[in-house]
Amino acid sequence: MPETPRLLFVHAHPDDESLSNGATIAHYAARGAQVHVVTCTLGEEGEVIGDRWAQLAVDHADQLGGYRIGELTAALQRLGVDAPIYLGGAGRWRDSGMAGTEQRGRRRFVDADDREAVGALVAIIRELRPHVVVTYDPDGGYGHPDHVQAHVVTTAAVAAAGSVGDCDYPGDPWVVPKFYWTILGLSAFLAGRQALTPDDLLPEWVLPPEDIPFIYPDERIDAVVTGDSDARAAKIAALAAHATQVTVGPSGRACALSNNMALPILADEHYLLVAGRAGARDERGWETDLLAGLGFTGFGT
């Protein structure tokens, strides 16, 4: 019986998996791959959209994190993933908040003991034995401290998981064949932005600038996963499940966070390969399957 491919995505907060990799997760899950998502915090510091759940926020009841467990569970189900996995267990590390916000000092993820956090992820990697691991680039995508910390922890854990000499961590060593950063590709973003019309937006939304600093030029991209109509629909449904944090527009072609900046909901999701050997590439020089070169068939886009 052929081996089932396994992919692991590591994210900082609930909703990050759907925003960054929703189409990719849905694509592989629908084709029978084992897909897991590790979330490092409960997202307690998130800014709540609207009035219905506003009293859950950190400055009021401080119950947002628990509520977002339900949102993440629903989102993952819509993407085809069974249940969330929280690094260290649900609530072990707290959302650190955006850079420059008040430091509440209660088990913040950025203050996590490196060996404990890395060890928790090593244990997951050695148990699940993923063929592909995905997390953020060194800047955490857009610079959120928890995203940066997720990058640091994941990078260290991928290295330690395959080390035969490091016996302090549980489980048998597992060398991750391919390790990617999730990135935002320039051409796809600009095309998605340009395609948005007033019918796609809510009245209070504004379009993002064209020169967002954390976008990657096409020549730096190593891989793209293009979600089909089912994967894109699953991504939209998953984003809608994160209703305290994300609003999906009337057409399903755009969404916005609490800052009311409209973002195109892209079916193309881009990656940079940072460890492992690339598989077949297309005429752009991009892989179209994160599993390319690993001997699996039927998973490309």
From Swiss-Prot:
Query: What UniProt keywords apply to this chain's record, in alphabetical order?
Result: Hydrolase, Metal-binding, Zinc
The UniProt annotation places Zn(2+) binding at: H13, D16, H147
Q: Which InterPro entries match?
A: GlcNAc_PI_deacetylase-related, LmbE-like_dom_sf, Mycothiol_biosynthesis_MshB
Record flagged with keyword Glycoprotein: no
Catalytic activity reads: 1D-myo-inositol 2-acetamido-2-deoxy-alpha-D-glucopyranoside + H2O = 1D-myo-inositol 2-amino-2-deoxy-alpha-D-glucopyranoside + acetate
**Biological process, per Gene Ontology:** mycothiol biosynthetic process
What does the note accompanying the cofactor annotation read?
Answer: Binds 1 zinc ion per subunit.
Q: Any S-S bridges, and between which cysteines?
A: none
Superkingdom: Bacteria
According to the UniProt entry, its GO molecular function terms are: N-acetylglucosaminylinositol deacetylase activity; zinc ion binding
Give the EC number. Answer: 3.5.1.103
* One Pfam family it belongs to: PIG-L
**What are its cofactors?**
Zn(2+)
Query: What does the similarity note say?
Result: Belongs to the MshB deacetylase family.
NCBIfam families for this protein: mycothiol_MshB
Q: What does this protein do?
A: Catalyzes the deacetylation of 1D-myo-inositol 2-acetamido-2-deoxy-alpha-D-glucopyranoside (GlcNAc-Ins) in the mycothiol biosynthesis pathway.
Question: What is the recorded name of this protein?
Answer: 1D-myo-inositol 2-acetamido-2-deoxy-alpha-D-glucopyranoside deacetylase
